[in-house]
């Protein structure tokens, strides 16, 4: 799949936020390893069920009458959330990040952006949670709640014995199918061809997902955001690396 992200409109959308915002955290103070052991999460607090989750802690009164619909899994420094927020201002989006310092950075950046745009109410629809999506996804989201899920430049876990730690596995794909509504979309991108093939294989093999065609991907404005919105994506570009995107649609459940 080769979707060209380089045209004037997409370049504008993909540029990192450059506005001067008082109180923005400095990323150099929040540096952490690029990836984290998904089993090192013993101090994470999570809701017993989605009914126990109080989203007002993340969104304030903006959560009233709304439910989270977009989930960026392993959101890193939150670049995708910042890009999608003005595109879908009425949609609640959550970034899930297991690394403590990184999730703290994203939260402080969101708070600073909200304060700076307080009169206009921008960025109230995005938030971050420190959580392990590999373990606790059904604790946060109800069946069919999400309309979009994002897996951007996930940890490739190169060693064969660690493939079970990859964020796309047969078991996890079934969980994603549970929380994703019919016609919902899973977006993936990586600079590791082996990981791309792995993710495509397991999503293709699941009976509740089908891959979008090239034309469907080109028609989706969100696809352009996958390439450059994240720090990892920008790093791949600087190193002249190749990026492999794929998008999958959640199919209706088969009749009983």
Swiss-Prot record:
It is found in: Nucleus. Its main location: nucleus. Its EC number is 2.1.1.33. HAMAP family: tRNA_methyltr_TrmB_euk. One of its GO terms (cellular component) is nucleus. Gene3D superfamilies: Vaccinia Virus protein VP39. This is tRNA (guanine-N(7)-)-methyltransferase. It catalyses: guanosine(46) in tRNA + S-adenosyl-L-methionine = N(7)-methylguanosine(46) in tRNA + S-adenosyl-L-homocysteine. GO terms for biological process: RNA (guanine-N7)-methylation; tRNA methylation. Belongs to the class I-like SAM-binding methyltransferase superfamily. TrmB family. Pfam families: Methyltransf_4. The keyword S-adenosyl-L-methionine applies. The keyword Secreted does not apply. Residues 26-36 have a biased composition (Basic residues). Catalyzes the formation of N(7)-methylguanine at position 46 (m7G46) in tRNA. InterPro entries: SAM-dependent_MTases_sf (IPR029063), Trm8_euk (IPR025763), tRNA_(Gua-N-7)_MeTrfase_Trmb (IPR003358).
């Amino acid at each position: 799949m080769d979707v060209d992200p380089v045209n004037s409109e997409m370049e504008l959308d993909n540029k990192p936020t450059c506005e001067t915002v008082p109180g923005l955290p400095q990323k150099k103070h929040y540096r952490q390893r690029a990836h984290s052991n998904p089993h090192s999460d013993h101090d994470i607090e999570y809701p017993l069920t989605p009914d126990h989750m109080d989203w007002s802690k993340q969104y304030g009164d903006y959560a009233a009458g709304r439910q989270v619909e977009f989930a960026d899994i392993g959101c890193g420094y939150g670049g995708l959330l910042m890009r999608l927020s003005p595109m879908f201002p009425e949609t609640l989006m959550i970034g899930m990040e297991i690394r403590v310092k990184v999730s703290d950075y994203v939260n402080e950046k969101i708070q600073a952006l909200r304060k700076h745009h307080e009169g206009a109410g921008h960025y109230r629809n995005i938030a971050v949670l420190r959580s392990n999506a590999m373990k606790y996804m059904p604790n946060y989201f109800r069946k069919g709640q999400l309309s979009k899920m994002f897996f951007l430049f996930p940890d490739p876990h190169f060693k064969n014995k660690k493939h079970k730690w990859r964020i796309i596995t047969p078991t996890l794909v079934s969980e994603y199918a549970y929380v994703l509504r019919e016609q919902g979309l899973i977006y993936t991108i990586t600079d590791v061809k082996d990981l791309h093939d792995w993710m495509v294989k397991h999503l293709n093999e699941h009976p509740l997902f089908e891959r979008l065609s090239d034309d469907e991907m080109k028609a989706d404005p969100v696809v352009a955001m996958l390439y450059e919105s994240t720090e990892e994506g920008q790093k791949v570009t600087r190193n002249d690396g190749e990026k492999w995107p794929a998008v999958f649609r959640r199919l209706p459940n088969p009749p009983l």
